[in-house]
Every structure is written in structure tokens, then in C-alpha cells.
Amino acid sequence: MKTFTYNNKDITIPKPFDSCFFGSNPLKEMTIHNRFNDEYYQQSATLPAFAVAIYDTIIGSEMSEDYDTMQKGLTWFQKYFTKQYFVLLD
């Protein structure tokens, strides 16, 4: 398992997400837009790159119908990035 310190919190990355590519700067903040935005309703959330990698894995798992991995990712997001979870994944 990998651990990152972000906003003075230690965040553990569980398997299988610990094998994600987190980029050269995993703590770099990125803005992700809700994938269901339209011209009347738009939401976005700021996340560190390591959380964006897990977000991408969740979306990919949903598309490939790997619901076990998807649920593990959703549970992780609910624990560590609750506000962003409700904006992006709920």
C-alpha cells in the first residue's frame, strides 16, 4: 500500500489502486468536471493527481462492468474525499 500526506492527512491507497500511475507529482491539484454537466448545471471538484488516477479507475471499472473494483474506489472516495465524491460520483 502507498500513503500520501495531503492537507495534513495521511491517505492510504489500497490495492488495486496502489498500482495506478499517479504522475510525476501525485500531489499536484487538478480540477475535474462532473461528467454529467450540461449548459445549465455544472459542477467541478479539485483533487490531487493521485485521487484523479483513482477516479479514472472507478470510471473505467464502471465502463468495463468491474463492479467490485468500482465499489472499492467509491468507498475509498467516500472516506477520504467526501465532498468531491458527492460532486463527481454520487
Name what the model sees in each region:
Residues 81-89:
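Acidic, proline/glycine-rich low-complexity IDRs
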